[in-house]
């Protein structure tokens, strides 16, 4: 599976390692950073757990986790 990741700068699409078959998007509201919302994108074997102030979305299609300000594709 190919997922968008914030582990690189700029954000790019990477092929996930074996065993990591999910893409995720984790967004944290302003409580996490003085700069506003924090967005984390990447690959995962299981959907990351969510804290009360976070929104976590997981999916299993290529590039299904775009940055909220990025157009899909």
UniProtKB/Swiss-Prot annotation:
GO cellular component, one term: extracellular region
Assembly description: Monomer in solution, homodimer in crystal state.
Localization (cell): Secreted
Main localization, broad class: secreted
Name of the protein this chain belongs to: Alpha-bungarotoxin N3
Keyword Secreted among record annotations: yes
GO molecular function: acetylcholine receptor inhibitor activity; ion channel regulator activity; toxin activity
The keyword Aminoacyl-tRNA synthetase is annotated on this UniProt entry: no
Record family assignment: Belongs to the three-finger toxin family. Long-chain subfamily. Type II alpha-neurotoxin sub-subfamily.
Record's keyword terms, sorted: Acetylcholine receptor inhibiting toxin, Disulfide bond, Ion channel impairing toxin, Neurotoxin, Postsynaptic neurotoxin, Secreted, Toxin
Tissue spec: Expressed by the venom gland.
Cystine crosslinks: 3-23, 16-43, 28-32, 47-58, 59-64
Function in brief: Binds with high affinity to muscular (alpha-1/CHRNA1) and neuronal (alpha-7/CHRNA7) nicotinic acetylcholine receptor (nAChR) and inhibits acetylcholine from binding to the receptor, thereby impairing neuromuscular and neuronal transmission. Mice injected with this toxin develop flaccid paralysis followed by death. Irreversibly inhibits twitches in a concentration-dependent manner in rat phrenic nerve-hemidiaphragm and chick biventer cervicis muscle.
Native species: Bungarus candidus
């Amino acid at each position: 599976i190919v997922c968008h990741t914030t582990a690189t700068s700029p954000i790019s699409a990477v092929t996930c390692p074996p065993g990591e078959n999910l893409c995720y998007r984790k967004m944290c509201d302003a409580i996490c950073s003085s700069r506003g919302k924090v967005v984390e994108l990447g690959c995962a074997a299981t959907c990351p757990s969510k804290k009360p102030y976070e929104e976590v979305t997981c999916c299993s299609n290529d590039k299904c986790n775009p940055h909220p300000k990025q157009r899909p594709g």
